[in-house]
């Protein structure tokens, strides 16, 4: 699809959905196959329908149109923060940790770059064309440059031995980050996973059937709703900035998003230890508990407790 065709499709979709979208209703944001350009078209078409500029109707926009600094790398940064938080709890030194990342799009490439900057050794990366392994560490900067100069593909990257995606998933590493598609880890390959820690950069990369297999093997898995929440968090920051008419610095965005993810991880980890359950189940409990307490306050059946200040 050409750029002009994609723009016409995006604008037609917005025309059909403009009553559903809104800065206080449903707010679209980028995901696979979309980015700042599509968000700009959507915002522009929505604004035309409303007769005024409404930049808070979407997030992930170009910065010149009200986008937030730190949004592009936000999901990958959240994966990095979650990974380091988990390694700390597991008493694994990041400077001695090996990492394999399946998927080298926005999330995977940023996670690789940020983890390498913090001392981890990224030994394997992959995309849809296959993977590359280097026991001494992939040169992440060169891999990103190669991808950018090769239409977004890692194909023919010279920085490591060629491997398959399945080989990457079953490598003996400290950290495995599935950052591609859903149902990457299933009951068919879960028994072959050798990583000590899985951090879900993608949405739903582990099937329901694979979860108990990983648990039985003692593999810690940071669930997607926690690990890749950085993008949603900074999207919220962008919306706040649009509504207030303020611009935050990159350091402020990083500091606030990192703090939220660390606090959420520590809360989920504490619940998992208290009840001897997986981090995924603990994350669901934390989320449901917060919603439940909110409803009980609203209907008058609950009274304020001191620990609610930290929730």
Where does each model-flagged region fall?
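Glycine/serine-rich phosphate-binding loop and adjoining beta1-alpha1 elements at the start
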Residues: 1-94
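Flexible, glycine/charged-enriched surface loops at secondary-structure junctions
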Residues: 21-30, 54-56, 90-98, 272-284, ...
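General beta-strand structural signal in soluble alpha/beta enzymes
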Residues: 25-30, 52-58, 124-127, 177-178, ...
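A glycine-rich phosphate-binding loop feature that marks nucleotide/adenosyl-phosphate handling sites
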Residues: 29-39, 59-62, 96-108, 129, ...
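Glycine-rich phosphate/diphosphate-binding loop of Rossmann-like nucleotide-binding domains
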Residues: 58-62, 66-73, 77-172
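Adenosine-phosphate binding glycine-rich loop
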Residues: 86, 193-310
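Short glycine/serine/threonine-rich phosphate/pyrophosphate-binding segments
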Residues: 107-111, 183-185, 206-208, 229-231
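Rossmann-like adenosine-cofactor binding region
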Residues: 130-221
């Amino acid at each position: 699809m050409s750029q002009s065709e994609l723009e016409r499709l995006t604008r037609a979709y917005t025309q059909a959905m403009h009553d559903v979208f809104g800065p206080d209703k449903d707010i679209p944001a980028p995901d696979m196959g979309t980015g700042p350009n599509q968000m700009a078209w959507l915002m522009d078409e929505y604004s035309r329908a409303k007769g005024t500029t409404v930049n808070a109707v979407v997030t992930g926009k170009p910065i010149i149109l009200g986008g937030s600094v730190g949004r592009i790398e936000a999901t990958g940064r959240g994966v990095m923060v979650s990974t380091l938080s988990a390694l700390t709890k597991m008493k694994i030194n990041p400077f001695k940790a090996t990492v394999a990342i399946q998927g080298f799009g926005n999330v995977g490439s940023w996670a690789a770059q940020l983890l390498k900057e913090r001392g981890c050794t990224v030994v394997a990366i992959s995309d849809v064309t296959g993977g590359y392994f280097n026991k001494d560490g992939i040169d992440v900067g060169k891999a990103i440059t190669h991808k950018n100069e090769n239409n977004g593909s890692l194909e023919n990257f010279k920085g490591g031995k060629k491997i398959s995606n399945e080989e990457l998933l079953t490598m003996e590493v400290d950290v495995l980050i599935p950052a591609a598609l859903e149902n990457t880890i299933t009951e068919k390959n879960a028994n072959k996973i050798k990583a000590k820690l899985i951090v879900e950069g993608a949405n739903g990369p582990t099937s329901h059937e694979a979860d108990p297999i990983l648990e039985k093997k003692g593999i810690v898995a940071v669930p997607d709703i926690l690990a890749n929440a950085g993008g949603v968090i900074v999207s919220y920051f962008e919306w706040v900035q649009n509504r207030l008419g303020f611009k935050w610095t990159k350091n402020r965005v990083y500091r606030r998003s990192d703090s939220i993810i660390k606090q959420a991880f520590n809360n989920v980890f504490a619940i998992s230890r208290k009840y001897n359950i997986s981090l995924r189940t603990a994350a669901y409990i934390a989320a449901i508990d917060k919603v439940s307490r909110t409803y009980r306050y609203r209907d008058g059946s609950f009274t304020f407790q001191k620990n609610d200040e930290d929730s």
